[in-house]
Amino acid sequence: MVIKNIDAATVAKKFLVRGYNIDPKAAELICKSGLFSDELVDKICRIANGGFIIEKSVVEEFLRNLSNLKPATLTPRPEERKVEEVKASCIALKVIKDITGKSSCQGNVEDFLMYFNSRLEKLSRIIRSRVNTTPIAHAGKVRGNVSVVGMVNEVYERGDKCYIRLEDTTGTITCVATGKNAEVARELLGDEVIGVTGLLKGSSLYANRIVFPDVPINGNGEKKRDFYIVFLSDTHFGSKEFLEKEWEMFVRWLKGEVGGKKSQNLAEKVKYIVIAGDIVDGIGVYPGQEDDLAISDIYGQYEFAASHLDEIPKEIKIIVSPGNHDAVRQAEPQPAFEGEIRSLFPKNVEHVGNPAYVDIEGVKVLIYHGRSIDDIISKIPRLSYDEPQKVMEELLKRRHLSPIYGGRTPLAPEREDYLVIEDVPDILHCGHIHTYGTGFYRGVFMVNSSTWQAQTEFQKKVNLNPMPGNVAVYRPGGEVIRLRFYGE
């Protein structure tokens, strides 16, 4: 797209991100020409004859040759669509729910009570829609089988039996699980909400069924679309280990500059990019992080991030959610970036909180950075970082993004629990653990979207082996394509 009103500093920045310095007089010449575009910058870089400084004479010769060509010679990029089309794309994206601008917690006792009551009520309502339950305090009055729903207070074992302490707003009860139910009970997490059906013997309920809130089979049903969504996370702009060359190759793919015809056709159909947190590497996140930073100023990291997102074709809508490395509060749910940081990014970027529930042309996407994955893996031995989609299944099964209170994931006691999965999404997108995995669970597409950071010294010490440069490209209701930009 040709931009008429452009200043020399912006022109210089465009050349700088491509590895070139431009003479100030040459930049002014481009401004006065009224022909500035990303394609023009690319073409000038190609004729720079290997030099790293773009002289005025180079620009003069280029513009002179350009004036002798037909206007159609500068082929419009895909992003040069009509303004109306871009606006229509923005309208098609709706933020349904996130915490931004709604946080009210002060951390007092009342906040904690309201937080846990909100969680209990939301998840109990889901279970009660499938099971006819009785308040725990009244369970003793029921003859035969009885069903209760409550929050898991404690799970312990004695012999081959597993005991579950369950509580609701009326009281507590001990549930006894044996056989296959005991296997299920051993994987229960503190503070999650479940239902139990069984026979009351004395003061204990002997379980014959444990009920999770879970998502219904087939989720919301298949929603076929003709566009593709790219899922990214953990870009870690500002890190010494940020994969600059791989990112550049990814952007070139989006522009249709690399790959075969099939790959280019795929890139043309990408309408949205969703980034699930850790946009920058941050400051003071872990011991010795300063040794891993290429940019030690947090604002500078976001400027660097914004300049890289600015290279993405403008017709692609980018949705950005924060993570634990970003400049927002550590406790979840996290709000979107503050205005000063948001102003750095191009206009095709939509900022949301963590988690965020968005509607993309009728496709419901739940974005969550995924910090609780660490907690879930530590509690359920069969799960691992190698298959993040298996962990995400557990989040959907429990209808909660971070069910464990008091684990590694700090949770803010908001008066409403924003991490309950009330509405079943079509897509659940997470990141955080720097590995790649996709799958389907009861009709919900799950994706954990890798990273753009190679292994850091700190990660070597804690034996974390990332799987960087993997990109999931998904057509709602259709196929998922995995692209590898690292190690190929």
Curated annotation (Swiss-Prot):
Catalytic activity: DNA(n) + a 2'-deoxyribonucleoside 5'-triphosphate = DNA(n+1) + diphosphate; Exonucleolytic cleavage in the 3'- to 5'-direction to yield nucleoside 5'-phosphates
Keywords, comma-separated and alphabetical: DNA replication, DNA-binding, DNA-directed DNA polymerase, Exonuclease, Hydrolase, Multifunctional enzyme, Nuclease, Nucleotidyltransferase, Transferase
The protein's Enzyme Commission number: 2.7.7.7, 3.1.11.1
Superkingdom per UniProt: Archaea
Annotated signal peptide: none
GO CC term (a single one): DNA polymerase complex
GO biological process, one term: DNA strand elongation involved in DNA replication
GO terms, molecular function: DNA binding; DNA-directed DNA polymerase activity; single-stranded DNA 3'-5' DNA exonuclease activity
Pfam families: DNA_pol_E_B, tRNA_anti-codon
Family note: Belongs to the DNA polymerase delta/II small subunit family.
Oligomeric and partner information: Heterodimer of a large subunit and a small subunit.
Function, in words: Possesses two activities: a DNA synthesis (polymerase) and an exonucleolytic activity that degrades single-stranded DNA in the 3' to 5' direction. Has a template-primer preference which is characteristic of a replicative DNA polymerase.
Name the UniProt record assigns to this protein: DNA polymerase II small subunit
Species: Archaeoglobus fulgidus (strain ATCC 49558 / DSM 4304 / JCM 9628 / NBRC 100126 / VC-16)
Gene name as annotated: polB
